[in-house]
């Protein structure tokens, strides 16, 4: 999982794109993955930047579900 940082609050990664349209297209793809994995990110978007945090809130820690979704996001 290249570029992800893990700490007590989750797996974190910032994605930077050329413009808002590219960032939005990426978020749309991640949304489909999240539905397929039945696991949804905490995220924010500001113009060309998307910040994603993955954590299993029910377990209060990073789990394999988070790592699998991070790997799927990396594969986009």
Language model feature labels by segment:
Residues 48-76:
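C-terminal structural segments of small proteins and small subunits
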Residues 24-30:
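Short amphipathic alpha-helix segments
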Residues 34-45, 75-76:
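A short N-terminal helical cap/helix-turn-helix that marks the beginning
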């Amino acid at each position: 999982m290249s570029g992800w940082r893990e700490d007590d609050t989750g797996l974190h990664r910032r994605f930077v794109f050329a413009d808002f349209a590219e960032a939005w297209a990426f978020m749309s793809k991640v949304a489909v993955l999240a539905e397929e994995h039945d696991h949804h990110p905490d995220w924010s978007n500001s113009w060309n930047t998307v910040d994603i945090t993955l954590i299993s809130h029910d377990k209060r820690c990073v789990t394999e579900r988070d790592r699998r979704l991070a790997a799927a996001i990396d594969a986009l």
